[in-house]
Amino acid sequence: MLEELLNGNIEKKTITQIYGPPGVGKTNICILSMLKAIENGKNVVYIDTEGSLSIERIKQLSEQDSDELLKSIIIYEPSSFEEQSEALEKIFFLENIGLIVIDGIVSLYRLELCDNINENTKLNRMLGKQISNLLKVARMKNSGILITNQVKDSINGIEPAGGRLLEYWSKSIIKLEKTESIRKLTLEKHRHAKEGENLRFRIVQNGLEIINKSYQ
């Protein structure tokens, strides 16, 4: 799916970010990207911070033997932002990693934000350290990075959560929207592909059905 929009695979050693509201299909796209990496003979790290990953959905979307497939997926389910940091550090010791997925990169971060300035400063430093480690391990392993992000209200409608830090370090940013049963991916930032291109699709039982690709 993302290959259609990016005119190629997810770029290695950099961050590709997909953002959109809950229930719009971000996890489905992550699963398909994960399956693509496994087809290429690689293992995938999947950090699921929101409990969105379904083994049954992986089996539905895959054409491979599910037992063999699951051997190629390393899943972490952190329950705190500190545990998310620990999960990232474990990746340094793994082998043959083709893709690192963090589904909900700032979900736990936002849950722990409070009125205490010192605590929030600590969280911001931790987020910066996570991004640093993520890029470091991806460069070491020659891996792609795919993160999903929540949205927040802004003057222009909605924008990705996480502030300028995630915006700066994400070399590809893709907006995901939903209108009734139709979803739309729009490429907002990319170093090589054409910004503004969009892809409309439907979520079906065995995958995603592309309707059309256009530019606006």
From Swiss-Prot:
Keywords: ATP-binding, DNA damage, DNA recombination, DNA-binding, Nucleotide-binding. GO terms for molecular function: ATP binding; ATP hydrolysis activity; ATP-dependent DNA damage sensor activity; damaged DNA binding. Gene3D superfamilies: P-loop containing nucleotide triphosphate hydrolases (3.40.50.300). GO terms for biological process: DNA recombination; DNA repair. The keyword ATP-binding applies. PROSITE patterns: RECA_2. Involved in DNA repair and in homologous recombination. May regulate the cleavage reactions of the branch-structured DNA. Has a very weak ATPase activity that is not stimulated by DNA. Binds DNA but does not promote DNA strands exchange. NCBIfam families: recomb_radB. Belongs to the eukaryotic RecA-like protein family. RadB subfamily. This is DNA repair and recombination protein RadB. It comes from Methanococcus maripaludis (strain C5 / ATCC BAA-1333). The lineage of its organism: Archaea, Methanobacteriati, Methanobacteriota, Methanomada group, Methanococci.
